[in-house]
């Protein structure tokens, strides 16, 4: 008897700065999925959050102009209906596994994971709470610190406490060179390296455009940027390590390096580091994955100082899958091919769904429970 193919739904796009990166990742994954094993549907969230159906999403996959397709599709949509944005969800009723390839807002912050949970379907990646915490740099650092995982010192600045953190005070505590980062943005959006009061104030003003929580971090001098990929649910493993080297004229691996002009960026995989340092970074990656309760996959980013001391930077719970993305490349050099990696991620999603199905949510029937007497005092 022939085995039934699994129906995989790729969700991509979204309203983040990585919309086009998401499209490229999803296209690569679609091409790599073994069509003898899987039936594949694709659903694109537009930049305004409207979910296109499979047919129209495939038109964009096949090269039609995205703006033209979206304009044509939404012209007759009644947006007074609060469910209009997700009206095409009816197409997913026979989906076996959701594969979100949405970076940043909506994709990595727990939003779309909540949708999958409501639909009671398996999905690749971390759960609702884990995704939300991992996307918030402030909550991530707090949780890692509680678990003894080394990360850079910082202060949290909000519109309410901004006056309590003038540049002079923060510089005295963390050093004159600082990084100013929105807590809940990806792709280095809104991140600034500052060295004086004027730059600091301008960076805060810009950062508040993207979030009301701003991290002001100490700057590690001339760090090496090292990456580690993690795979698994509870039984997890770390990949070999990779490194990013940017042009000497640039301050850090910023949005421009990532998406505008990456011609001067060098990716080294695997990177040759002292064995002790390599093992420490791999162990910190596994410890962080567990502390954040991640599932399926994550890429861990580190800064290594001149004394070979690694500092945890951040976690990416839905890393890119483009031709130059580090997550799949690190597994490639670790012995797992691109297509095999995708097969494993799909199985991990099914395993996690089945494990969660064993959890009981039984409640006493309302009206049958025994209650105490209510005493009204004077």
From Swiss-Prot:
Pathway: Cell wall biogenesis; peptidoglycan biosynthesis. Residues 141-347 form the ATP-grasp domain. This is D-alanine--D-alanine ligase. The gene is ddl. Keywords: ATP-binding, Cell shape, Cell wall biogenesis/degradation, Cytoplasm, Ligase, Magnesium, Manganese, Metal-binding, Nucleotide-binding, Peptidoglycan synthesis. GO terms for biological process: cell wall organization; peptidoglycan biosynthetic process; regulation of cell shape. Cell wall formation. It catalyses: 2 D-alanine + ATP = D-alanyl-D-alanine + ADP + phosphate + H(+). PANTHER family: D-ALANINE--D-ALANINE LIGASE, D-ALANINE--D-ALANINE LIGASE A. Its cofactor is Mg(2+); Mn(2+). Mg(2+) 1 binds at residues 301, 314. Binds 2 magnesium or manganese ions per subunit. One of its GO terms (molecular function) is ATP binding. HAMAP family: Dala_Dala_lig. InterPro entries: ATP-grasp, ATP_grasp_subdomain_1, D-Ala_lig_Van_CS, D_ala_D_ala, Dala_Dala_lig_C, Dala_Dala_lig_N, PreATP-grasp_dom_sf. It comes from the Bacteria. It is found in: Cytoplasm. Mg(2+) 2 binds at residues 314, 316. One of its GO terms (cellular component) is cytosol. It comes from Ligilactobacillus salivarius (strain UCC118). Belongs to the D-alanine--D-alanine ligase family. Its EC number is 6.3.2.4. It holds the Pfam family Dala_Dala_lig_C. ATP binds at residues 171-226.
């Amino acid at each position: 008897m022939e085995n039934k193919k699994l129906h995989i739904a790729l969700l991509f796009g979204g309203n983040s700065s990585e919309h086009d990166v998401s499209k490229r990742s999803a296209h690569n994954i679609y091409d790599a999925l073994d069509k003898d094993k899987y039936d594949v549907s694709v659903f694109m969230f537009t930049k305004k959050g409207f979910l296109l159906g499979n047919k129209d999403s495939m038109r964009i996959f096949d090269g039609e102009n995205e703006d033209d397709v979206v304009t044509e599709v939404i012209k007759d949509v009644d947006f007074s209906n609060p469910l209009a944005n997700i009206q095409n969800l009816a197409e997913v009723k026979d989906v076996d596994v959701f594969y979100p390839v949405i970076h940043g807002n909506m994709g990595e912050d727990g939003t779309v994971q909540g949708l999958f949970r409501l639909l009671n379907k398996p999905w690749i990646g971390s759960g609702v709470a884990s995704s939300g915490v991992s996307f918030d740099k402030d909550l991530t650092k707090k949780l890692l610190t509680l678990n003894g995982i080394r990360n850079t010192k910082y202060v949290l600045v909000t519109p309410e406490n901004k006056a309590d953190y003038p540049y002079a005070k923060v510089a005295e505590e963390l050093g004159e060179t600082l990084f100013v980062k929105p807590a809940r943005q990806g792709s280095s959006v809104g991140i600034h390296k500052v060295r004086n009061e004027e730059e600091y104030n301008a960076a805060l003003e810009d950062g508040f455009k993207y979030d009301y929580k701003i991290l002001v971090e100490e700057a590690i001098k001339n760090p090496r940027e090292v990456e580690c990929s993690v795979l698994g649910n509870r039984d997890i493993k770390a990949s070999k390590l990779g490194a990013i080297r940017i042009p000497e004229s640039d301050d850090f691996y910023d949005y421009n390096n990532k998406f505008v002009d990456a011609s001067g960026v060098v990716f080294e995989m695997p990177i040759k580091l002292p064995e002790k340092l390599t093992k420490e970074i791999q162990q910190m990656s596994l410890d962080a994955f567990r502390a954040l309760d991640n599932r399926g996959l994550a890429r861990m980013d580190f800064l290594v100082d001149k004394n070979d001391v690694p500092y945890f930077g951040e976690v990416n719970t839905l890393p890119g899958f483009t031709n130059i993305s580090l997550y799949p490349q690190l597994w490639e050099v670790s012995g797992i091919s691109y297509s095999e990696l995708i097969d494993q991620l799909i199985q991990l999603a099914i395993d996690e769904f089945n494990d969660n199905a064993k959890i009981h949510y039984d409640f006493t029937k309302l009206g049958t429970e025994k209650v105490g007497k209510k005493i009204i005092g004077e």
